[in-house]
Amino acid sequence: MRFKLLCAVIVAVSLCSCSAAADFANGPADSITMPPGNRVSQTLLAGDKLVTFRSWLDIPYVKNPVEPEYQRLNIYVPEEYFHGETINGYTAKTAPILMPNGVGGYLPGKQFIPANDTRHGTPNVALYALSKGYVVISPAIRGRTLENGKAPALIVDYKAAVRWVRHNKDRLPAGDTEKIISDGLSAGGALSSLLGATGNAKEYEPYLQAIGAEEERDDIFASVVYCPITNLENADMAYEWIFNGVNTYHMGPAREMDDNMKAASDALKAAFPAYLNSLELEGYELDDDGDGSFKEYIEGLYIAAAQKALDAGENVLGLEWLEVDEDEGKVTGVDLEEYAEWATRMKAAPAFDSLNMKSFENNEFADAHFTAYAFEHSTAEKPAMADADKIYVMNPMNFIGKEGVSTAKYWRIRHGVKDRDTSLAIPAILALKLKQAGYDADVAAVWNVPHDGNYDLPELFEWLDGICKK
């Protein structure tokens, strides 16, 4: 009976929401106000907790949208804040604002909608956040398949949404605009890292002005980053540093790399140490063979993931790439070559800037190369090189520690042990550069997890509460 009643409430409330949301969305972006006296709410079951919240949908966040269907956002506010109540120690004024993005594969991303995630068997990040007292504001974002969605459209939109939130801070019914948190996975993780790294960077200003973004700050408090497909102009080298020697790839049916791909793998692996060393990460380097303290650091991340799983009672034995002292209950070593065989290669070399210029990432750069190696060895009929300025603004590494940029203070970066969409080296490098620049970066590999995100919500929100309540 309780389930039937709840479903009826959800349906009825959802139908009413559309009208109120439409009232909120009418008019130019700079004249939007919260509808006075709005009592429309939704109720969903998050685990064993009923969560009631108000919704405003499809609000334009720029004055001159070039893709109006996407340059809109949704706002979700816990009902308790309309009655002067607290949730999880937060009030309407102190509630953090979670801004998750729905981008994947550099495709257009729709707004997150609070719901239960059938894949993980848990509430999704938006619903879970509401249950913990967070305000959720989720923008839709342009992507590579739209006429006006090529790089750097997605980060421009994300920034514009943050600016809209700050511009309307006195109109929002709840939420602390100095506690804005980004969240994303895969290309969305790259986007989350870009938003966190590039706060107020002047390089984006012409793009923001062109779409009529508000003249506000776009720095944020914290970035949540899962398996980011980022640092694209160096990601091919990092991928081959791990997967060189594994010549079968699994993008669809298993296939063997051809001679051009194998040659690319060898060359890119050989080039990675020079790139890593050029970053001058204190205490981390590689020799010409790709060995050294940075390799030991990567091995340590895998060891820590396995140890955490072992301590939790999971079986990590019987893997050729993992050394375990069963008597002591300690994971003692990792063989990265054996790891690559076990994980399997997903992508042929080059993994991101493909020689035929047909990867998702090539498409993101308007069907062009973005690395010197792929451009010089291109098999495309008409090779093209992406604009250098656009390549630059798509890489968060270029902005960490840069004068005039306000990088997020707090970072949580996760990469699954079974993930072979990109190399663990990429998020690890991001975290090390952040730490060296004085930022708080919590990075870890996660046992038995593939290319995925928001799979550890209790741990995530324990971390978020820890930084938000300081």
Name every feature range the model reports, one short phrase each.
Residues A22-G89:
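Catalytic-loop region of hydrolases
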Residues Y226-T344:
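Non-catalytic, alpha-helical, charged scaffold/linker segments
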Residues G149-R171:
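Alpha/beta-hydrolase active-site loop
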